[in-house]
C-alpha cells in the first residue's frame, strides 16, 4: 500500500514519458545503437534522470497540495488523502534528488547532471509557481520538458551542440499543443482552482489556433536532425511522416469536430507521434 502511494507521488507516467524522449536523444548520439558498448551508460542515465524527474514530481505535489484537493482528477493523490505527510514527502523528494545527483555525477557526466538540474529548477521553481500567476506557465514548463532528450544526447557525447538544440526544439514545440490539449480537456477543474490557463483567459478558439501554430513549428523542427547531418534518411522519413500526419489529423479535427474532440485528437496523436519519433531517432 505505502510503496504504491510513494510510487504514485513520483508520477510514474510522467517519468516513463520523459524516459522515452531521453531515449530519442541517446539514440541520435549513438546512431540508433544500444549494444554492449552503450548499454551500461544508457541504464545509468535512465536511472539518474528518472530519479530527478521523480524528485521534481514529488516537490510539485507538495506545492500543489492545496489546488489538488479541489480538482476532481487529483483528489486521490497521496498528499491530499493524507496517506503521505508533507514531511515524509519532503524527505522522499530530497532522497530522490540526492541519489539522482550521485548517479549522474559518478556514472554519467557532469554536463548531463547540470542539464538535468536546470530542468528540475525550471519545473519546480518556475513552472510550478508560475502556473498560478500567468498564462505563459505552459511555455515555461516546456523548457523543463524539453530537457530529457538533451540529457540523453549529452550522456553520450558530453557536449552541447546544434544537435542538442534541435532535440530541445522538437520537444519544446511538441509540448505546447500537447499541454494545451490537456488544459482544454480539464478546463472545468482548472476553473475551480482559478488557474490562469490559456483556454480560460484567452478562450478556446484562441488556444486552438496557438496549438496549430506550435504544431507547424514542430513539423519544421523535426527536419533539423537530418539537416544537421546527424539523423539518417530512415529517421528523417519517419519523423516527417508522423509529424505531418499529426498536423493533418489536427487540422481536420479543427475544421469538423467539437472543441473537446479536437483536444482529444491532438492529445492522442501527440503520444503516438513523439514515441515513434524518439524510438526511430538516429
From Swiss-Prot:
Primary location class: membrane
Family statement: Belongs to the UbiA prenyltransferase family. Protoheme IX farnesyltransferase subfamily.
Protein name: Protoheme IX farnesyltransferase
The organism's place on the tree of life at top rank: Bacteria
TM segment ranges: 9-29, 39-59, 79-99, 102-122, 139-159, 165-185, 210-230, 231-251, 261-281
Species per Swiss-Prot/TrEMBL record: Francisella tularensis subsp. holarctica (strain FTNF002-00 / FTA)
Membrane topology: Multi-pass membrane protein
CC annotations in GO: plasma membrane
Its EC number(s): 2.5.1.141
Enzyme class name: transferase
Gene symbol of the encoding locus: cyoE
General function of this protein: Converts heme B (protoheme IX) to heme O by substitution of the vinyl group on carbon 2 of heme B porphyrin ring with a hydroxyethyl farnesyl side group.
Catalytic activity: heme b + (2E,6E)-farnesyl diphosphate + H2O = Fe(II)-heme o + diphosphate
Keyword Translocase in record: no
NCBIfam families (alphabetical): cyoE_ctaB, PRK04375.1-1
Compartments (UniProt record): Cell inner membrane
Gene Ontology BP terms: heme O biosynthetic process
Amino acid at each position: 500500500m505505502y510503496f504504491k502511494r510513494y510510487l504514485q507521488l513520483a508520477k510514474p507516467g510522467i517519468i516513463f514519458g520523459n524516459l522515452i524522449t531521453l531515449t530519442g536523444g541517446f539514440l541520435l548520439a549513438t546512431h540508433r545503437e544500444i549494444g554492449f558498448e552503450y548499454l551500461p551508460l544508457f541504464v545509468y542515465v535512465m536511472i539518474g534522470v528518472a530519479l530527478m524527474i521523480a524528485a521534481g514530481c514529488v516537490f510539485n505535489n507538495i506545492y500543489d497540495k492545496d489546488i489538488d484537493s479541489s480538482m476532481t482528477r487529483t483528489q486521490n493523490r497521496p498528499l491530499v488523502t493524507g496517506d503521505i505527510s508533507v514531511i515524509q514527502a519532503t524527505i522522499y523528494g530530497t532522497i530522490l534528488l540526492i541519489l539522482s545527483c550521485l548517479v549522474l555525477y559518478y556514472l554519467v557526466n557532469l554536463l548531463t547532471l547540470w542539464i538535468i538540474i536546470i530542468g528540475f529548477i525550471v519545473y519546480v521553481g518556475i513552472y510550478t509557481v508560475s502556473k498560478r500567476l500567468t498564462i505563459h506557465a505552459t511555455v515555461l514548463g516546456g523548457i523543463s520538458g524539453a530537457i530529457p532528450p538533451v540529457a540523453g544526447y549529452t550522456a553520450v557525447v558530453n557536449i552541447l551542440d546544434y544537435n542538442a538544440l534541435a532535440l530541445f526544439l522538437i520537444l519544446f514545440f511538441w509540448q505546447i499543443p500537447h499541454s494545451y490539449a490537456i488544459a482544454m480537456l480539464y478546463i472545468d477543474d482548472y476553473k475551480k482552482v482559478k488557474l490562469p490557463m490559456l483556454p480560460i483567459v484567452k478562450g478556446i478558439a484562441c488556444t486552438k489556433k496557438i496549438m496549430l501554430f506550435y504544431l507547424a513549428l514542430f513539423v519544421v523542427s523535426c527536419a533539423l536532425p537530418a539537416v544537421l547531418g546527424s539523423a539518417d534518411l530512415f529517421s528523417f522519413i519517419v519523423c516527417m511522416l508522423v509529424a505531418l500526419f499529426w498536423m493533418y489529423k489536427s487540422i481536420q479535427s479543427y475544421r469538423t469536430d467539437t472543441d473537446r474532440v479536437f483536444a482529444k485528437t491532438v492529445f492522442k496523436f501527440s503520444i503516438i507521434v513523439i514515441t515513434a519519433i524518439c524510438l526511430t531517432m538516429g
